[in-house]
C-alpha cells in the first residue's frame, strides 16, 4: 500500500520554467568552466542542520476542499514537531499568513512569499557546501513534475530561499526535483531513472550527461540508478519513496506487500539492485526493508494515499516519521528506525491529510545544512 499522488485536478499545463539544457543559457561544457574553481558536495540528511524549510502551500485550487484544512493542520504539526529540535522557516502566501501563524505558533518562522503548493523537497534548493564551508543552493528548474501542475510561483522558490540565506545560487542545466536524489554524504547517490531520465524533464539528455552534471554539482563519485516507474504518479517515481540512506553503507528500502500494486514488482527489483550494489567507497550496501501498512485509517483513504513509512525526515537529534493506524507495522517501523538511528528520538505523526495528497513528511521538508 504505497500509492503516491497522481495527476492533480488541473491536468497538464504549459510550463513557464526551463525544460531544455539549452534554455537555461548554459551548455554542459560551459557549466563545467563556470564551476571548475569550486568543489561542492551535498551533505547527507543526517548531518547537522542550520534549519528546516517548509511551505504552507496547500490551496483550494489544487487540493480537494475537504482535505485542505486537514493538510494545513498536518503541515503545522510537522513544523512544530521539528521546531523542537531546530529552526523551521515556512513559506506562506500573504492571504494565508494569519492562519499559518495561528496553527504554527511562534516556534515557526513564517516568510511571506508566493507559492503554488507545499512540496518544498521538490521546489526548494538542494543545498550543497564547499570544502571551505561556503553554502550553495542548487536550482533544478522545477517544472511541475514534467508539466503536470501549475508551478509559475514554485519555480522561483529555490532561488528565493538561496538568496534569503545569502548562499550562492547554482542553476543546473538539468530539470529534476529534490525528491529524486538521495545521498550518503560520502560520494554516493541513489537516483531514479524514471524521473531524471524522462523526456518531460530532460529531453535529449543522456545518462552520462546527467551523471556529469550531478557529480559536479553534488560532489558525487558514484550514482546507483534505480529504474523507478514513470507515469503512475505525478513524480514519475521519486527515490525518496523507494530507498533512503540511513548512514553511509546502509540503505532502508520500501517493500510493497500488495501484489496488485504497481509498486509490488518494482520494489523487489530495486531490492535486487541495491543488494548487489557497492557505494563510492567500495562497500557492499546493507539493505534494510520497511514494509508498508496493510491497513490505513479510512477517513482520507484514496487511490493517491501515500502509505509509505520510508518518507521520514531526519532533523537534529530526531527522526520524524508517519504512522498510519496499522498497529503492527506502525510498531515495527518505530522499532526498525530506532535500531537504525539509535542516537535519535523517533517521533511518529498522523499526517493522513498530506498522505492523501500522495506525499509525506520528507516531501514537505528541505534541510539546510549547518
What residue ranges belong to the model's regions?
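The feature marks the mature, well-folded catalytic cores of soluble enzymes
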Residues: 35-370
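N-terminal export signals
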Residues: 6-28
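Boundary at the C-terminal end of the N-terminal hydrophobic targeting segment
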Residues: 29-34
Amino acid at each position: 500500500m504505497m500509492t503516491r499522488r497522481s495527476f492533480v485536478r488541473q491536468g497538464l499545463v504549459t510550463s513557464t520554467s526551463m525544460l531544455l539544457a539549452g534554455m537555461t543559457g548554459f551548455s554542459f561544457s560551459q557549466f563545467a568552466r563556470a564551476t571548475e574553481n569550486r568543489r561542492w558536495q551535498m551533505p547527507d540528511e543526517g548531518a547537522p542542520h542550520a534549519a528546516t524549510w517548509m511551505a504552507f502551500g496547500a490551496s483550494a485550487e489544487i487540493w480537494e476542499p475537504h482535505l485542505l484544512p486537514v493538510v494545513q493542520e498536518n503541515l503545522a504539526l510537522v513544523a512544530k514537531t521539528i521546531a523542537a529540535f531546530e529552526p523551521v522557516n515556512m513559506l506562506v502566501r500573504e492571504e494565508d499568513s494569519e492562519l499559518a501563524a495561528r496553527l504554527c505558533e511562534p516556534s515557526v518562522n513564517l516568510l511571506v512569499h508566493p507559492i503554488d503548493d507545499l512540496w518544498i523537497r521538490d521546489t526548494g534548493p538542494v543545498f550543497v557546501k564547499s570544502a571551505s564551508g561556503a553554502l550553495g543552493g542548487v536550482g533544478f528548474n522545477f517544472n511541475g513534475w514534467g508539466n503536470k501542475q501549475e508551478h509559475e510561483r514554485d519555480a522561483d522558490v529555490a532561488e528565493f530561499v538561496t538568496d534569503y540565506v545569502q548562499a550562492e545560487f547554482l542553476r543546473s542545466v538539468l530539470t529534476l526535483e529534490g525528491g529524486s536524489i538521495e545521498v550518503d554524504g560520502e560520494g554516493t547517490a541513489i537516483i531514479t531513472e524514471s524521473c531524471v531520465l524522462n523526456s518531460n524533464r530532460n529531453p535529449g539528455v543522456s545518462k552520462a550527461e546527467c551523471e556529469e552534471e550531478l557529480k559536479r554539482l553534488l560532489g558525487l563519485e558514484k550514482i546507483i540508478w534505480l529504474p523507478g516507474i514513470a507515469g503512475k504518479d505525478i513524480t514519475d517515481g521519486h527515490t525518496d519513496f523507494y530507498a533512503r540512506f540511513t548512514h553511509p553503507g546502509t540503505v532502508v528500502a520500501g517493500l510493497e506487500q500488495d501484489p496488485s500494486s504497481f509498486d509490488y514488482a518494482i520494489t523487489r527489483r530495486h531490492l535486487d539492485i541495491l543488494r548487489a550494489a557497492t557505494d563510492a567507497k567500495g562497500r557492499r550496501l546493507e539493505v534494510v526493508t520497511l514494509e508498508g501498512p496493510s491497513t490505513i485509517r479510512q477517513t482520507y483513504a484514496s487511490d493517491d494515499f501515500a502509505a509509505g513509512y520510508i518518507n521520514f525526515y531526519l532533523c537534529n537529534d530526531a527522526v520524524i516519521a508517519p504512522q498510519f493506524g496499522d498497529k503492527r507495522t506502525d510498531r515495527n517501523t518505530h522499532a526498525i528506525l530506532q535500531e537504525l538511528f539509535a542516537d535519535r528520538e523517533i517521533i511518529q505523526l498522523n499526517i493522513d491529510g498530506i498522505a492523501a495528497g500522495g506525499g509525506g513528511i520528507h516531501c514537505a521538508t528541505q534541510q539546510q545544512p549547518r
